[in-house]
Amino acid sequence: MAVINVTSEIGKLKKVLLHRPGKELLNLTPDKLDELLFDDIPFLKMAQKEHDAFADILSKNGVEVVYLEDLAAEAVSQSAEIREKFIKQYINEADIYSEYYQKMIYDFLNAIKDPKELILKTMEGVNANEIPFKNTHSLSHYVLDSGSMVINPMPNLYFTRDPFACIGNGVSLNKMYSVTRCRETIYGEYIFDHHPEYAGKVNRFYNRYDAPSIEGGDILNIGKDVLAIGLSQRTSANAIDSIANNIFDNETSPIKTVLAFQIPAIRAFMHLDTVFTQIDFDKFTIHPGILGPLRVFEITRGTKKGELNVKQIDSTLEKVLEKYTGAGKIELIQCAGGDKIAAEREQWNDGSNTLCISPGTIVVYERNDVTNEILNKKGLKVLEMPCGELSRGRGGPRCMSMPLLREDIR
């Protein structure tokens, strides 16, 4: 049995990866918001309650919930050598250049014996007050403020969709768009390299060390043989070319077509799933703001290795989806019904970002009243979750989840 199986966006969800927000959110400060890609500072206690409610909804609907921090801890605890390599790599990727600082931080982290506590600490970041640095008579020492972060936190980790994406029986271990998020993929690397459940059992279609950026929020499994990827602020055309070649060259992958959806390269539309998600065989949520500028390209295998056939599809989005899903007539349900003010407001709070846990059953943010009422009237089973704090991170239920196993649809 495959340990990864995701061939659609709507097949019954069997197993999902989450990250419960932790102390990394406590290390968010107003002067770091832009650098760390946040617009506001969530209240951790409430964010955790909301996230627990999310996990509870999934569990009550038959989904096995596993956590990034647990899998990563199990991976690094496989041997002393793996643990040592992880700590050194973590420090190196945090751009700690002084050998003295590297040693002091290594000793500090290595003293944390519990593997889960170690993982959580690396996610939280390291404060200068935690380490007894001596005066090294260097400029870097003199400008190090007491109480400042020596290693920044990773507050975006609760959006588990982005660092890697499951595609069929394989994964794309992503190269993130922003410097501040590139370090997040270290946990996926160690899980797929060293965790006994996954090591050596999962095809890798993209590597975190590749140059062009690609993020999981732009990757949608339209069907067993069709993959959709957003050409967006966070995912480049070069990355789509590269992953398409890797998928087509993999003999075990059934994917024959990659559809590239070009959307405006702005933060409000940062990923394809921010503005477009599948919720049933024949239904998709969509933000009306992308309907005008959206372009779709069909990518298939070329006649030679490394060569692709690319053509722009001159058709409506509905017709494109009807062709590639085989679902018959497609209905696009606009965020807030297309009302300009309500759509912009609810789009800001991820009204189009839904997590489908089985055909027609979706998890949504409760605050998007207009969109949720429309979805209910369309006959969907709408499971609302609290989101007052989680939504401050600008990501919805799909962003906060990485399906590992789904039933295939027929």
Swiss-Prot record:
Reaction(s) the record says it catalyses: L-arginine + H2O = L-citrulline + NH4(+)
Enzyme Commission code(s) on record: 3.5.3.6
Pathway: Amino-acid degradation; L-arginine degradation via ADI pathway; carbamoyl phosphate from L-arginine: step 1/2
Chief location: cytoplasm
Enzyme class: hydrolase
Keyword Cytoplasm among record annotations: yes
Gene Ontology biological process terms, A to Z: arginine catabolic process to ornithine; arginine deiminase pathway
Active site (catalytic residues): 399 (amidino-cysteine intermediate)
Subcellular location, record wording: Cytoplasm
Keywords annotated in UniProt: Arginine metabolism, Cytoplasm, Hydrolase
One GO cellular component term noted in the UniProt record for this chain: cytoplasm
Pfam name, any one: ADI
Keyword Manganese found: no
One function term, GO molecular function aspect: arginine deiminase activity
Taxonomy, superkingdom: Bacteria
Family listed: Belongs to the arginine deiminase family.
Protein name: Arginine deiminase
Naturally occurring in which organism (per UniProt): Treponema denticola (strain ATCC 35405 / DSM 14222 / CIP 103919 / JCM 8153 / KCTC 15104)
Gene: arcA
